[in-house]
Amino acid sequence: PTRIFTLNRVELQREGTIHPTQKPVKLYEWVLSLFARKGMKILDTHAGSASSLVACQRIGGLDYVGFEINEKYYTAANRRLEEEKAQMRLFDLLEEQEKAAQTTLF
C-alpha cells in the first residue's frame, strides 16, 4: 500500500522556522502516531528545531530526548519546546475541570 502525506509549506513558513531543514510538527505527529506507543522513549540525535520533540509533547505519553550540537539551534529549540509545554490544551483543561468537579462531589 502507498501512503501519501501532503505537507503545507506555507503553514511552516507562517509558523516561522529556526532551522534550514526544519520539518513540520504535523509530519512527526503523523509518523509517531503510526509507530510510537505510549511509554516509548523517543531519541532525536539531530534535534535541530525540535519539531520531533514538540510532536512528542503534543501527543503525550512519550518520553523524549533530543541532542543538538549547534548552540544557536539548541537555544532556539529549547525555547520552542518550553513554549509548547507552557500551552494549555483544551482537552487537558476540560479533564482538569472534570476531575475538580468529581472531587468536590464527595
PLM regions: where:
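Class I S-adenosyl-L-methionine
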Residues: 1-106
